């Protein structure tokens, strides 16, 4: 059966002051369609770098990353950008919302760029699902931290990607908002039959996934 994602002997190295730093070493795993995976490990173990590699935001030093049978490292930048826009949604702990755009405009912009029909109503629909139906016309500065995070997630998944990459999506939130965000992500994955790879330090959140991958010193344990 074809896998949604496959990593084979992936390495990521940096040269700093003539010293070779091994960020990720011989990382191999597969992701099925509709699978949820949590990636755990200590700070600096390489978790975020893994998300960056899969999303095509970093280039592996060696090894192979295949998404739907396309080898990410062999694609041109515009081809990778196209995949990120339509097939892979990325949610970061630190995100950027356009400050002079309303919540609705921040989300609908992704649809407009991709020439999707009826972008406003589609953006309204997902924001309403995220409990922001009454905040559509608010600027980011008028939203709480949890509300801003929900807008950022809505923007990342409004194109209905097959794979969501989430890097500490609840890291800066209180327990109430953390639970809300986690419910949003897992409900979306279930409804849209998508896959999720989520980096988290929260054991309770990690255990919501079907599988847990632990990284230590750049290696999968």
Regions of interest found by a model, annotated:
Residues 55:
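Helix-to-loop junction immediately C-terminal to a conserved catalytic motif
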Residues 101-109:
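Short coil-to-helix segment of the ABC ATPase nucleotide-binding domain corresponding to the Q-loop/switch region
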Residues 40-42:
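The feature captures the beta-strand-to-loop junction immediately N-terminal to the Walker
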Residues 63-71:
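Conserved ABC transporter NBD signature motif
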Residues 139-149:
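Conserved ABC ATPase signature
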Residues 85, 138-141, 159, 192:
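Conserved signature/switch motifs of ABC ATPase nucleotide-binding domains
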Residues 164-167:
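Catalytic Walker B motif of ABC-type/P-loop ATPase nucleotide-binding domains
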